């Protein structure tokens, strides 16, 4: 029996997020410390195996309430099902004939949940990779993020942008330009300009995430989308500014101007704070890191932060201070 195993890694937005859903620009990194893995093999029926994240057994009603508060109502089964449906639709729309063999598929993930590290899209991307391998269908790399995004936006009605899917498909570090001027359409799929950057250009960076408090990403994004669509100038100007920060960040990386990059990271968060109403515990994470002398911004939708630190002594201080407020700190593995 041939067993197909595919992984997709957590990600952190270095600069520009959350402008990816608003024709902005971002730089993101993949974090190989955390991953989702999907295993698929031939079976006599289509069998989606429940994961430990799809909890249905609780110690008490209070345990159930706590699980919902931290992780929301949904596990990964709906993501796998929606990915399969979207893949089949993609192939049908292009007259790509699929063989009639069935499969069993299961997933597991160690990506911290609901802290903005793209745990949901990692399951989708890993599932999509398994399906392409099983059916011998090769979706062009530049189009894969858009197909993965459509699983959430079209199948599940979740507000999301391309950033997470781009970095999980490309891996490493990627500069992304979502301006309409660079928009391209191939085989009915819309995509944008994605440029790989050498991870060796990165300064010493940390990622810290809270392991007790969280907020589902789909909840986080909804209000800003409505304000943007209504033409609120504060939100529109902020999204444009995120793009400018990203262009400057790319230049800072290429010239190894780490002090400039660090300042841009701080400015990214300050701009975000000007348009979002943020929970105090998320602000506290950023301010705690800054008091250590590091830069800090959200790595995603909130619950995890990323920034530049100076040396090992500073990193140890960050770890200690973050632990004191219930957060864990890592050095992300990026390659």
Predicted ranges, named:
Residues 117-119, 295-301:
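Short glycine/threonine-rich catalytic loop with a Thr-x-Gly-x-Asp
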Residues 24-26:
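Conserved, well-ordered active-site substructure
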Residues 117-137:
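DPxDG-like acidic metal-binding loop motif
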Residues 1-15, 19, 28, 32, ...:
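C-terminal nucleotide
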Residues 100-102, 302:
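Glycine-rich nucleotide-binding loop
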Residues 104-105, 142-145:
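Short, charged, amphipathic alpha-helices and their helix-cap/turn boundaries
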Residues 83, 113-115:
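Helix-loop-helix module between adjacent transmembrane segments
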């Amino acid at each position: 029996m041939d067993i197909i195993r595919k992984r997709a890694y957590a990600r952190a937005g270095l600069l520009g997020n959350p402008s990816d859903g608003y024709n902005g620009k971002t730089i993101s990194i993949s974090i190989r410390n955390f991953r989702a893995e999907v295993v698929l093999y031939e079976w006599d029926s289509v069998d989606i195996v429940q994961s430990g994240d799809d909890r249905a057994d609780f110690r008490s009603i209070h345990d159930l309430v706590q699980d919902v508060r931290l992780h929301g109502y949904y596990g990964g089964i709906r993501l796998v099902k929606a990915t399969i449906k979207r893949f089949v639709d993609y192939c049908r729309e292009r007259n790509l004939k699929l063989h009639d063999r069935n499969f069993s598929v299961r997933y597991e993930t160690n990506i911290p949940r609901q802290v903005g590290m793209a745990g949901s899209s990692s399951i989708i991307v890993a599932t999509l990779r398994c399906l392409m391998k099983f059916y011998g269908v090769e979706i062009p790399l530049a189009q894969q993020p858009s197909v993965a995004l459509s699983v959430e936006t079209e199948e599940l009605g979740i507000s999301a942008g391309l950033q997470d899917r781009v970095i999980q498909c490309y891996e490493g570090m990627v500069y992304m330009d979502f301006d309409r001027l660079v928009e391209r359409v191939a085989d009915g799929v819309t995509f944008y300009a994605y440029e790989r950057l050498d991870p060796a250009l990165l300064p010493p960076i940390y990622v810290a995430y809270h392991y007790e408090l969280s907020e589902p990403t789909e909840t986080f994004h909804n209000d800003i989308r409505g304000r943007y669509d209504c033409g609120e100038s504060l939100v529109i100007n902020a999204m444009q500014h995120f793009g400018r920060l990203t262009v400057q960040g790319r230049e800072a990386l290429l010239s190894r101007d780490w002090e400039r990059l660090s300042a841009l990271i701080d400015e990214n968060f300050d701009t975000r704070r000007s348009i979002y109403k943020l929970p105090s515990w998320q602000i506290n994470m950023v301010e705690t890191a800054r008091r250590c002398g590091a830069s800090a911004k959200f790595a995603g939708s909130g619950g995890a932060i990323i920034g530049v630190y100076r040396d090992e002594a500073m990193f140890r201080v960050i770890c200690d201070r973050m632990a004191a407020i219930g957060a864990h700190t890592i050095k992300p593995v990026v390659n």
